[in-house]
Amino acid sequence: MSTLIEAIVAREVLDSRGNPTIEVDVRLESGDVGRAIVPSGASTGAHEALELRDGDKSRYNGKGVLKAVQAVNEDIAEALIGFDAADQIALDQELIALDGTPNKSKLGANAILGVSLAAAKAAAAAFGLPLYRYLGGVYAHVLPVPMMNIMNGGQHATNSTDFQEFMIMPVGAESFREGLRWGAEIYHMLKKVIHDRGFSTTVGDEGGFAPSLPTNDAPLQLIMEAIEKAGYRPGEQIVIALDPATTEIFEDGKYHLKREGRSLSSAEMVDYWVDLVNRYPIISLEDGLAEDDWEGWALLRAKLGDRVQLVGDDFLVTNVQRLQRAIEAKAANSILIKLNQIGSLTETLSAIQLAQRSGWTAVVSHRSGESEDVTIADLVVATNAGQIKTGAPARTDRIAKYNQLLRIEEELGSAARYAGRSAFKV
């Protein structure tokens, strides 16, 4: 059985928004093949690795990825054919060196990540192992609590709230299967609640409902009603997570809440979150402040860090250097993990390990532009991270990850453990 790379082929495919993205196949001398499709985001952090797009307005409004495809089929293939796919760290180091830029702008983080993931999948297949076991070893056994984005606003919807995501987390369930069922039942009840109030039940990019609502906490009121009407206890069985994506509403040193007609300073924004946490069972707040508001983040943690998981997404961009700085500055206490923010599997695993060693939590996440690729489901189990953020229980691009987790839980049998409330350090 040889795990040496025999061929690497990339192609342009479509993501869940109908935009082009890159798919990569890596074939080994053993005949085993790994395939990966790279996701893309709508609200992207300024410090993310660069997603290479063509910029040719005559194709896909400039969003084509033929340059990234060419980078894989020519530069990367030439460098990696004959390379051992089982040597993941060396392979990723070779890709990073081949690019030679700080943000992967030469070859594109999308090109590099596609090869990085496809190689790992090919190696796992060659060893006859599921991806979670190949990456995580014998101790990979924790099924995550899903962060289910059941109401969308901000960049993921139009004419909705200032804030991007309102999520539920079934922390009181006994298993992932049960937690998923609870979430799905609440999701369907929420649709009825929204419909009965005369609002639209159209969905956003991640499957959550996106009605036009009068205030920013109106979605929380509707979600609380749906939880109770579905027969569950808020704060005990079901808790709430928010991703307001405040970088999107931050300008000239202020947070502009257009739905409420006011602009807030960093300190006022922190007080805003304290008030919401006092009124609703919110356990997790992601990007509660803008990506470079370091002083604000430290204040947020000082005021809420012992009660709420404070997740850095645009703030930390799965980047070890930014994470290390945040740990030292006591800004945030959790990191969102998005493979394509940093652009390689090894760097992603390094960020998760640093967070866990530092007593932080790590939340493995999708992007708003997704596909049928289920890598993140295996990654979250491989790292025992305990939390996954992959949308509403709707749309195949989201459901694919949940279904993969159901399969993994079944395969693990009695060894499987659902993270539940122990997923949190607060």
From Swiss-Prot:
<keyword id="KW-0460">Magnesium</keyword>
<feature type="binding site">
    <location>
        <position position="367"/>
    </location>
    <ligand>
        <name>phosphoenolpyruvate</name>
    </ligand>
</feature>
<dbReference type="GO" id="GO:0009986">
    <property type="term" value="C:cell surface"/>
</dbReference>
<keyword id="KW-0963">Cytoplasm</keyword>
<dbReference type="Pfam" id="PF03952">
    <property type="entry name" value="Enolase_N"/>
</dbReference>
<keyword id="KW-0324">Glycolysis</keyword>
<keyword id="KW-0964">Secreted</keyword>
<dbReference type="GO" id="GO:0004634">
    <property type="term" value="F:phosphopyruvate hydratase activity"/>
</dbReference>
<feature type="binding site">
    <location>
        <position position="41"/>
    </location>
    <ligand>
        <name>phosphoenolpyruvate</name>
    </ligand>
</feature>
<dbReference type="GO" id="GO:0005576">
    <property type="term" value="C:extracellular region"/>
</dbReference>
<feature type="binding site">
    <location>
        <position position="206"/>
    </location>
    <ligand>
        <name>(2R)-2-phosphoglycerate</name>
    </ligand>
</feature>
<dbReference type="InterPro" id="IPR020809">
    <property type="entry name" value="Enolase_CS"/>
</dbReference>
<feature type="binding site">
    <location>
        <position position="368"/>
    </location>
    <ligand>
        <name>(2R)-2-phosphoglycerate</name>
    </ligand>
</feature>
<feature type="binding site">
    <location>
        <position position="43"/>
    </location>
    <ligand>
        <name>Mg(2+) 2</name>
    </ligand>
</feature>
<dbReference type="InterPro" id="IPR036849">
    <property type="entry name" value="Enolase-like_C_sf"/>
</dbReference>
<comment type="function">
    <text>Catalyzes the reversible conversion of 2-phosphoglycerate (2-PG) into phosphoenolpyruvate (PEP). It is essential for the degradation of carbohydrates via glycolysis.</text>
</comment>
<comment type="subunit">
    <text>Homodimer.</text>
</comment>
<keyword id="KW-0456">Lyase</keyword>
<comment type="pathway">
    <text>Carbohydrate degradation; glycolysis; pyruvate from D-glyceraldehyde 3-phosphate: step 4/5.</text>
</comment>
<dbReference type="GO" id="GO:0000015">
    <property type="term" value="C:phosphopyruvate hydratase complex"/>
</dbReference>
<feature type="binding site">
    <location>
        <position position="243"/>
    </location>
    <ligand>
        <name>Mg(2+) 1</name>
    </ligand>
</feature>
<dbReference type="InterPro" id="IPR000941">
    <property type="entry name" value="Enolase"/>
</dbReference>
<feature type="binding site">
    <location>
        <position position="286"/>
    </location>
    <ligand>
        <name>Mg(2+) 1</name>
    </ligand>
</feature>
<dbReference type="InterPro" id="IPR020811">
    <property type="entry name" value="Enolase_N"/>
</dbReference>
<keyword id="KW-0479">Metal-binding</keyword>
<protein>
    <recommendedName>
        <fullName>Enolase</fullName>
        <ecNumber>4.2.1.11</ecNumber>
    </recommendedName>
</protein>
<dbReference type="Pfam" id="PF00113">
    <property type="entry name" value="Enolase_C"/>
</dbReference>
<dbReference type="GO" id="GO:0000287">
    <property type="term" value="F:magnesium ion binding"/>
</dbReference>
<dbReference type="GO" id="GO:0006096">
    <property type="term" value="P:glycolytic process"/>
</dbReference>
<feature type="binding site">
    <location>
        <position position="338"/>
    </location>
    <ligand>
        <name>(2R)-2-phosphoglycerate</name>
    </ligand>
</feature>
<feature type="binding site">
    <location>
        <position position="338"/>
    </location>
    <ligand>
        <name>phosphoenolpyruvate</name>
    </ligand>
</feature>
<feature type="binding site">
    <location>
        <position position="313"/>
    </location>
    <ligand>
        <name>Mg(2+) 1</name>
    </ligand>
</feature>
<feature type="active site" description="Proton donor">
    <location>
        <position position="206"/>
    </location>
</feature>
<feature type="binding site">
    <location>
        <position position="368"/>
    </location>
    <ligand>
        <name>phosphoenolpyruvate</name>
    </ligand>
</feature>
<dbReference type="InterPro" id="IPR020810">
    <property type="entry name" value="Enolase_C"/>
</dbReference>
<feature type="active site" description="Proton acceptor">
    <location>
        <position position="338"/>
    </location>
</feature>
<dbReference type="InterPro" id="IPR029017">
    <property type="entry name" value="Enolase-like_N"/>
</dbReference>
<comment type="similarity">
    <text>Belongs to the enolase family.</text>
</comment>
<feature type="binding site">
    <location>
        <position position="165"/>
    </location>
    <ligand>
        <name>(2R)-2-phosphoglycerate</name>
    </ligand>
</feature>
<feature type="binding site">
    <location>
        <position position="367"/>
    </location>
    <ligand>
        <name>(2R)-2-phosphoglycerate</name>
    </ligand>
</feature>
<feature type="binding site">
    <location>
        <position position="165"/>
    </location>
    <ligand>
        <name>phosphoenolpyruvate</name>
    </ligand>
</feature>
<feature type="binding site">
    <location>
        <position position="313"/>
    </location>
    <ligand>
        <name>phosphoenolpyruvate</name>
    </ligand>
</feature>
